[in-house]
Amino acid sequence: MSEIFSGIGFDAHKFGDKKGAWIACLEWPESLACEGHSDGDVVAHAICDALLSAANLGDLGSNFGTSDPKWAGVSGANLLAEVYNLITAEKFKIQNVSAQLIGNSPKIGPRRDEAIAAISSALSGARVSLSATTTDGMGFTGSGEGLAALATVLIAR
């Protein structure tokens, strides 16, 4: 009988001054890019943290720290694939991934299916759902200073 483990992840980044954001493993050329050591993909990073949390394998910082130049500029898709390898090495299987982008822009709806496919591909075909919300003008996402994402996962072993 399999044991089920749940994990939660969160990430937030402020916008920089250049266009070409990476969000949910897709490039959004007209959106401001998020600043960060990697590509600033808040959705991918939140999913990574949720998976690592569920497997009790630490978090992004402890596995892919900013002090290691190897991870500078790395894509969210590559981080997801690395995390997938870490959790499958411990005999975990992903049951479900659910992520939510928090911010005013870009609007995920028109590219939701494409984003789900990209995230799922990075996780070797895992079941993924993606939604988005705003904070009705409140906080740094509401004022347009950046983006955040929340993710929950279920994994089994």
What feature does the model see in each segment?
Residues 2-118:
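RNase III-family endoribonuclease catalytic core
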Residues 109-110, 137-141:
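Short active-site-adjacent structural elements
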Residues 130-134:
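Pyridoxal 5′-phosphate
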Residues 141-157:
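C-terminal edge-of-domain segments
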